[in-house]
A protein has these predicted regions:
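Mid-chain, well-packed structural core segment of small domains
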Residues: 65-103
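Short active-site oxyanion
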Residues: 7, 28-35, 107-108
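General beta-strand structural signal in soluble alpha/beta enzymes
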Residues: 36-38, 56, 82, 110-114
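Histidine-anchored nucleotide/phosphate-binding helix
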Residues: 17-28
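Short internal beta-strands
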Residues: 32-45
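Short, glycine-/small-residue-rich phosphate/pyrophosphate-handling segment
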Residues: 115-150
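Short, acidic/small-residue loops that bind anionic groups at enzyme active sites
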Residues: 100-120
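Short hydrophobic/aromatic-enriched beta-strand-loop microsegments
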Residues: 34-35, 51-62, 131-135
Length: 162
């Protein structure tokens, strides 16, 4: 069974409209992702009527950021879109810092602006497309090598024993 990674979506209150706009613009691409969001963000996406299946964890204030960090450690989350309100200090700032630290430690990208999120979403789409093409390339290589070996064998047979 192949692992299907998850994309985490988090937005602070002042950034929720921007995330909703992004999700609406990229809805088709996001449909192909396993999505997880903090509670209020997930509820907002569900209420928006988008055709996205979004799992939720606790709100950020109640440990949701840490649950997503745990998902990174477990290898379940391989990308994070976090539209973070950097103008305010948050009571759970240590959790946010921990999420950023864990993501950096495990090499998981975090997109912190709508433009960066679009780049991430499109890169993930290309990665999925390449995975679909790879078996075809592998079959081509195997077939090419088999033909090469047959041609080499035929050439040696025509040359006769040394």
């Amino acid at each position: 069974m192949t692992k299907r990674p998850m994309l985490a979506l988090i937005a602070h209150d002042s950034q929720k409209d921007a995330l909703l706009h992004l999700a609406a613009q990229e809805e088709y691409q996001l449909r192909h992702e396993f999505l997880v969001a903090t509670k209020k963000t997930g509820e907002l996406l569900a209420a928006a009527g988008l055709h996205l299946a979004v799992g939720t964890v606790e709100s950020g204030k109640c440990g949701g950021d840490l649950q997503i960090a745990a998902g990174i450690i477990e290898g379940k989350v391989d990308g994070v879109i976090f539209l973070h309100d950097v103008r305010r200090h948050h009571a759970h700032q240590v959790d946010i810092d921990a999420l950023y630290r864990v993501a950096a430690l495990y090499g998981v990208p975090i997109a912190s602006s709508p433009d960066a999120a679009r780049v991430m979403i499109r890169a993930r789409r290309r990665k999925r497309e390449l995975r679909r093409v790879e078996p075809t390339l592998q079959a081509f290589r195997e077939n090419f090598n088999a033909k090469k070996l047959r041609a080499l064998g035929a050439a040696q047979q025509e040359a006769g024993p040394n």
